[in-house]
From Swiss-Prot:
Zn(2+) binds at H473, H477, H480. Expressed abundantly in the testis. It is also found in the liver, lung and kidney. Its cofactor is Zn(2+). This is Thimet oligopeptidase. One of its GO terms (molecular function) is metalloendopeptidase activity. Keywords: Acetylation, Cytoplasm, Hydrolase, Metal-binding, Metalloprotease, Phosphoprotein, Protease, Zinc. It is an enzyme of class 3 (hydrolase). Monomer. Belongs to the peptidase M3 family. Binds 1 zinc ion per subunit. One of its GO terms (biological process) is intracellular signal transduction. PROSITE patterns: ZINC_PROTEASE (PS00142).
Amino acid sequence: MKPPAACAGDVVDTVSPCSTVNHLRWDLSAQQIRALTTQLIEQTKCVYDRVGAQDFEDVSYESTLKALADVEVTYTVQRNILDFPQHVSPNKDIRAASTEADKKLSEFDVEMSMRQDVYQRVVWLQEKIPKDSLKPEAARYLERLIKLGRRNGLHLPQDTQEKIKNIKKRLSLLCIDFNKNLNEDTTFLPFTREELGGLPEDFLNSLEKTEDGKLKVTLKYPHYFPLLKKCHVPETRRLLEEAFNCRCKEENCAILKELVSLRAQKSNLLGFRTHADYVLEMNMAKTSQTVATFLDELARKLKPLGEQERAVILELKEAECAKRGLPFDGRIHAWDMRYYMNQVEETRYRVDQNLLKEYFPMQVVTRGLLAIYQELLGLTFTLEEGAAAWHEDVRLYSVRDAASGEEIGKFYLDLYPREGKYGHAACFGLQPGCLRQDGSRQLAIAAMVANFTKPTPDVPSLLQHDEVETYFHEFGHVMHQLCSQAEFAMFSGTHVERDFVEAPSQMLENWVWEKEPLMRMSQHYRTGGEAPEDLLEKLIKSRQANAGLFNLRQIVLAKVDQVLHTQTDVDPAEEYARLCQEILGVPATPGTNMPATFGHLAGGYDAQYYGYLWSEVYSMDMFHTRFKQEGVLSPKVGMDYRTSILRPGGSEDASTMLKQFLGRDPKQDAFLLSKGLQVEGCEPPAC
């Protein structure tokens, strides 16, 4: 049997004739997105057809494994050009076209992942080729393709494969719609200035007005979090918290129900007891029982701390009600949590958040953050003036290795909210750093997308300290994308085990709790003066404030996720309410449906939200074992970190990387101490 004729043209050249370095482009119209989506599918399918049509005796590394790896590189870049605009484009038509492109391409991804003809030739190659003839990463790639083939059911009967394929296609569409609904939500609540009592003037002045002069408060983060923390009018907080947790309630509730059911069906067809067990097979945790034990033990250890913190909050609430002449009901409501947790910081630790943010103007934080990352990781960043992007607010930086001067990547910063934009903070890998078809290395390119408070004509963007922490976290993901030197796109950047992926960026959050880094990224926005030492010392001491309640809430979210993916016929809203009461000791607001707003459930974290806590075990161990001992800003430790943790991407197991960096197997001690818990034989970490 002859292979089909060679595919016409090269995907990169025909779909996106850009520079030889940055293949990304952001000037496509909705019509072009639609046309190029069809073209990309046709050209990529041609490669799969050629691989799948080979006679078995013709199967080789070059014709099979390398062909699949090469097309993955070009396909990934072109796909991102077409489907990333749905998250960031200011043009609604382009967002819609990009969303449709994502749906088509997701369906195509399913089709290609279910190619039994290709799978059979990959299996044949593994049996035919001596394992030691492949480089370690190529051998890992071969093993991973076979593992993924089995996880797609390609070893099962044809009718079962068809069922799995149809379920996968439907799941892709549902996930896209779930998050699109949240991104496109434009709900706002109108309030008078009196109803927004307690909020600072700069916040109030930044709000748009309704026709009758009321102030518009949206459900986006830069409005939601400040109001929940600072507004002293309980009814205003209640209305906003209720609206926030009712976003897309009806449509996403229906989507979530179908998602959970289809995931369970697919996992059962593949021989797994639950969807969680199917997902976790590829993670460090391996089984749902391991995750359940981890969460239960942590909840048990944190419970006394949570009880103490709730008692403090009730005291504060009683005093507040007496002061403002409000009735005290003796209970903590969901809309009370952030307000009184903020009061704990301000009264018990004397941290004035409004004063603090005056020392964190965006420009100063960005300058300090970039300087710290450059020094720590041995890099040089250069702003590319006038670079093309998807919006005028976006900035593009070039990244070079400081020692060699070699360019290793670029990153975009898109930091302010816009209508229709992705509503959280995230890092998007756009161009994987890996080897291209000719053996040259492709530049890694990533985008950090966030929603920090916009500047006004009078006041620059001022960041809350937790926003500075978010900035450091997400930029940590950017560095993971750019410093990775994997050979295969499949292992580039953050393509590591999902319950390890947060560890590298979580570790870098520690810098916003250390005095020297804080001094370097703070300066008063009016006077230019340094942040007072006592203000920073109070902030650093407040790190463990509310640690019990904050982490118990993380456990609630992780358990909701696990329950939905280990049990059938569970009502998500009821389950969330039960766990809030049982673990957090604070009831969910009646009538709300938080899981319908929980983007992680449809954003690749299904059965894996526990990973935020799980990976913190490793992030805290890395920080306290190396950086805290040898120097928080030590370039030597930073380079060890870049080499051992960031450089491999997913080309090695996380456990191997950790052992190399730590010099031993990981331990939980630093993690537990960071939560304010006692560990036998260990001193608490110095603040």
